[in-house]
Amino acid sequence: VRHSPWKVASLLFCSGFCALIYQTVWLRQFRLIFGASTFATGAVLAIFMAGLGIGSALLGKRADAKERPLAYYALLEFFIAVAAALSPLLLWVAARIYFASGGSPDLGIAVATLLRLFLALLVLGPATFLMGGTLPAAARAVETNDDSGRRGVALLYGVNTLGAVAGALLSTFVMLETFGNRRTLFIAVLVNLIVAVIARSMARVSPASSRPEDFEDTGTGWKPAVLDRPVYIASSLVGFAFLLMELVWYRMLSPVLGGTTYMFGLILAIALLGIGLGGAAYSLFRRGPATPGGFAITCSLEALAIAFPFALGDRLAILANVLRDLGAVGGFGGHVLSWTIVTVIVVFPAAFIAGIQFPLLIALLGRGRENVGRQIGAAYAWNTGGAIAGSLAGGFGLIPLLSAPSTWRLVAVLLALLAFAAVLVAARARQHAFATATIIIGIAAIAATFAPGPTAVWRHSGIGAARAPKPKTRNELLEFLHNTRRIIAWERDGRESSVAIAALDDTAFVVNGKSDGAARHDAPTQVMAGLLGGIFHPQPKTALVVGLGTGSTVGWMAAIPSMERVDAIELEPVVLDVARMCEPVSADAMKNPVVKVTIADAREVLLTTDKKYDIISSEPSNPYRAGIASLFTREFYEASADRLNPGGYLVQWVQAYQIHAGTMQTIYGTVTSVFPHVLTWWTSPGDLVLVASREPIVMDVSQLRRRIAQEPFRSGLHNSWRVESAEQFVARVAANEDFARAAAKEAPAINTDDRTVIEFGFARSIDAAATVLGQIMLTAHNMKMNAPVGLRGDLDWKAVDANRVWSLRRAPADNPPNLAVMATKTLEMAKNGDVRAEVFAAILRQREPLESDVILATLRSRQNRQDEAAELLRGALVAYRTNPWPDPDVMFSGVELAMNVGRGSPQRARMLYDAMSQPFAVMLQENYRRQVLIELASMVDRCGPQTLAAIRAVEPHPYWTRDMLELRAECYARNGLEDLAERALEDLATFDANTPAPIITPQSPPTPRGSS
């Protein structure tokens, strides 16, 4: 008597639910031990999948020999639950062993990887080995010999995978945030035990027969269409392709969906949903035995399903940008819906076809119950082996070597070629069904890979981080597309991330679609994250910095005279190239022998090293990104405290944007649970830096004045903050230690390794306009909690308050309290022709000669003394090539002024053209500089060599304004560049076609009534 397939399938649903939760929790837990590097994650995934594959192969054979396979299944589920319940203890043992070993910094990558494999095997081996045997055992319990297509196997496979979908969604969106890792794991253990009990009960009531007569020939004369070995190889290849493609999906969807834990869970859930529904569809609709031709067409269809979203390219990115508005309507649920729509388009079709493939391969091996356990086990083992190879090949080789888009192309071509090979096998077996369709679809898939595919608009525009503009018209959209593609100066796919340099108005390095720092505009945070701890510590000798980035934090910290060693911990090797490009603002960090860069995970380093530091500065990426929140946990701060010398400081960056008050309270609560004394500084309108210590933070005013007058503090404070005095420095204190403790008392939770609540809090507010800087400063001011508790000595508090008032209002003051306000105020005077600007410009010249020149040039231009203005401006523009520290607003005004001063005089235009012909330091104002350069060139030689060179320098992404497009078309036509002229005219026609027609044409005004 066979068991009801649907009853057994319900058990498999719960089994899949538990297995996915186990996998999710174990990966998160191992990330806390080994770190989040590709090497570490790859080792854990390899053991997890290898355990499944080996267990499937070995236990599948045993399932065929069992008289009561459902009882065998129940036993497997029981011991899986036991092994999972023991895993927290085994993880603790693994952590102690790994931390004692010194990790990858001491052992090296090769030895550390071997140790990770061993420890992962210790923790995961028993459970995953047993998991591998569950599907063969369950299939043995439901299959009958009259099931020629093995639809029962497909049903179990599909429903098991749908259970995994439920596990992925519930764990990601509910359980991990609510219960934490450990309790989520034990909930799954409880469900697993219930499954074991129910399965055992079902086995007692209705045992399946395994007698020899069950395998007697039914008289149909059926023989396998192909030998076993080709089927196993095919199973391996599709496993390789799908896992490789899964890595590409994660890498490519992160820029448009945000890279949060929610995104990764959603991609996994959609992929599993497709597989599950594909398996169920095979079970419900497949009639008759499987054929090689059927497998061939699934491969070609999967290739097309993968290639089609690639061919859509930036259209999908634009769709994702448009769908962001769903978040404004439906809140977080609207965001999830928008992510789901994009993910379904990209992932679901290929996953659905992959779900059909596996049961089809099982059906190619045999029919009914005969050897079903062994064949499922072997096919699954080969499939898992291919998946392991695909995962390792993608993470360690193909994506960094070829880039993610090229790997996307490769997967589609590989599947198309596999389809063609399957057609040949089918032809030899004289099975010609689907051959023509397979070839046509496969060729279409390969053809689709020749499309441009995703460009910088998809990969680097910040759509997922809510940084991309939302165009309202067709021309605004085209302007966005051209601008985004034009400003990307450099890009690489690294081992861990995709990295690019966006040269809009600065050297901004973009990681997985979001800017993680700009050389000049983020210098107020990056430089001072390196210097704040050094200002308070009397003689810092050793420091550790989490995250290399532009190198500014590391470089300025290393410039402190007493500093002997600065260890910079960076996860992505490609970022070292970024740091080298930013040396003009980083005090030549990468050339300083004091700086030692380690490519590793920061948690791993802190937990395995025995070094002690005077300062630890942590400036990772945003906590909403998967895995980053573990650098903001109580355990991370405890490890930091253990690594600090007495009197040492932790300097922690916190974003002040896209954050709600509850999340900020949690951060305060977490930091103060380890460091009772926390001083909050505002470094820029969007950034906070917490200076934390186990001892009271003492700020002696006389010592402070001496300290900030010394180098590198004097230059660092001036360049980044425009701070010249102790009063201006203290004005940067947003809140004192009492405020931090008061906020901590209201924290809704503590961010821990087990429950990283800020990860989810930040992810829910990723598209929010919420900021906390103003709230913190106003509340601290009203509660008199904005003066450092440990302040000793006299300060001019009126000057402190004047600086704070300006910082909150962001408006020029009548009596400028600092150089930044003075520059803004004086520039405004110059633009209005106010001669008082000369007096302030003379004062500014002592510390800000470039700002002074630009302001005077502005005044002279306003006074119609254009030759004097041009000369002053020329000097400033040439100096900008090597000086990265000008005031950004004044600099922009100077570049804009060059265009106005150059008009009417080819000589002035040529002078300014020559001054702007080279990029400024760290590519400041690069996009605008190139645009103004075209304008100046046209004033010099209207479509001559200079104009032509300036226009061609931005091809094929012109500035999308009518004047620029018209000039471009004219110059190409006049120089006989027919192909370029034709394209330029097409672009101009497109611009005009998308420009609304005026109600009244300006060239033809109507005749007034009554005129003759």
Regions found by a protein language model. Name each.
Residues 793-835, 855:
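Alpha-helical segment of the N-proximal tetratricopeptide repeat
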Residues 807-811, 834-845, 867-880, 905-920, ...:
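Alpha-helical repeat scaffolds
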Residues 1-706, 710-713, 762-768:
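Alpha-helical transmembrane segments of multi-pass membrane proteins
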Residues 701-805:
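SAM/dcSAM-binding transferase cores
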